[in-house]
Amino acid sequence: MYTSAEVWVREFVFEVFQRPFGGEVRWCASWQDHPEAVLRLEAMWRAWEVLHQDDGLGLSRWLLSHFDPSFTVLTGRTGPFARCTVERHVA
């Protein structure tokens, strides 16, 4: 459905999961420069591509087992974006 994790983040994640970034929830506009973020988002995208096709519990399984825990780590106070802001990348 999506050709890459980068396209999936831009066209799906940001459209569906709109979070107010700042404070406890962190994001980096240069997420591609954070190896952990790339790995986690790639894993979430690959799981999405398989599980969203499951008419049964696929979406629930994806949310609970893949998206929720990984996105919480990514955007948390001690995650890969801990020193970044939406406007400022810190390697």
Language-model features: where?
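Alpha-helix boundary/N-cap detector
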Residues: 4, 8, 32-42, 54, ...
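Short terminal alpha-helical segments
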Residues: 1-27
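Amphipathic alpha-helical binding modules
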Residues: 56-91
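Alpha-helical repeat scaffolds in large eukaryotic proteins
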Residues: 10-17, 42-52, 68-75, 79
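Amphipathic alpha-helical interaction modules
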Residues: 17-51
